[in-house]
Amino acid sequence: MEQHTIITIDGPAGVGKSTLAKKLGTILNLPYLDTGAMFRKLALQLGNKAETLPDSILQEQCKKVTFQLQGVGKNSLLMCNGESIGHEIRSETAGILAAQLGERTIIREYLKNIEQQIGNTMSIIAEGRDLGTEVFPKAQFKFFIDANPIIRAQRRFNQLKKEGIFQDYNDILHSINYRDKLDKNRTIAPLEPAKDAILIDSSIMDIDSILKIMLNYITIPHLSQ
């Protein structure tokens, strides 16, 4: 059976995981899997009442939502039910809904299964929160990116502004702190670095500097699709 290469990039919101995954994917000619987008899209598809649904009903609702991954690098495209995922998932509302639903074992196991199926069929760069610890514990290369919440909020504000989405900075900072608390204190797959992950603080580093560090650890001969 062919061994696919898995590179995981974990960390809280606003540390640059998506940008790093896209650029790294372009350099290494690998698709990148945005698992945060999967959580957000699933949360929006299920609606704001999903958190209170019984496990049996929630499980049936999840089965109606499927994901597919196409392309490589910056051209990687995550599809939901055969359609591309839009900017609607980048709202803070979607982020909070996703964090709340992340407390449900049914949700985490459903998406974990899809993510592992994708990783079994191709080499990927996967970014999220618990990939190195829960989803791909045997990944060949693991990174955990962190940064000061104030800096992360400013980055998020700038990112949303570029996308034409205007939100109050203080609301974004509050949302980040709230989500950090949920992510770090949940009983199921809490946000924490894998024991064998490379830890990088991106507070005072630009993307290119972080990429250089990551590429120093990634040995190209291991890469195979």
Curated annotation (Swiss-Prot):
Residues involved in ATP binding: G11, P12, A13, G14, V15, G16, K17, S18, T19
Gene Ontology CC terms, in alphabetical order: cytoplasm
Membrane-crossing residue ranges in chain numbering: none
Superkingdom of source: Bacteria
EC number assigned by the record: 2.7.4.25
Keywords, ordered alphabetically: ATP-binding, Cytoplasm, Kinase, Nucleotide-binding, Transferase
Enzyme class: transferase
Positions of disulphide bridges: none
Short name of one Pfam family: Cytidylate_kin
GO biological process, one term: pyrimidine nucleotide metabolic process
MF-aspect GO terms: ATP binding; CMP kinase activity; dCMP kinase activity
Catalytic activity: CMP + ATP = CDP + ADP; dCMP + ATP = dCDP + ADP
NCBIfam families: cmk
UniProt record similarity statement: Belongs to the cytidylate kinase family. Type 1 subfamily.
Name this protein carries in UniProt: Cytidylate kinase
Provenance organism: Lawsonia intracellularis (strain PHE/MN1-00)
